[in-house]
Amino acid sequence: MYYLKQKFYIILNNICYDNCGIKFILKVFAQSKECVSNSVFAQLSPTQSTATNTTYSNSNSNSNSNSNSNSNSNSNSNSNSNSNNNNNNNNNNNNNNNNNNNNNNNNNNNNNNNNNNNNNNNNNNNNNNNNNNNNNN
């Protein structure tokens, strides 16, 4: 029988790993957590205390970031940068909606420009016709 000594153990989500990345069984002995291998665990009794010189640590890290930027020719621009997990989807949906709105605004502006150009062309044609009529008279 032997204890696992002089090793560094990490417990993540109730899974025990040694400092070589080998997974061990995590069991509770004498009100304490202990990392033991399959072969050693068969030899230990619930009354034995935990192994000495053992360090446990818990570590969790999560990060997300999204960055979106939209601009159109009618001076509307939107930009969002988010790092919250729960808000990223909503912000992406909002950005997509803003993109659609900007595209619609661009289309409307293009239509207005086309209409203005048509009106200008019609006015020019009318002016030319009037000039021709005046010249004929």
Curated annotation (Swiss-Prot):
Residues 48-137 are annotated as: Disordered. It comes from the Eukaryota. Residues 57-137 have a biased composition (Low complexity). This is Putative uncharacterized protein DDB_G0283051. It comes from Dictyostelium discoideum (Social amoeba).
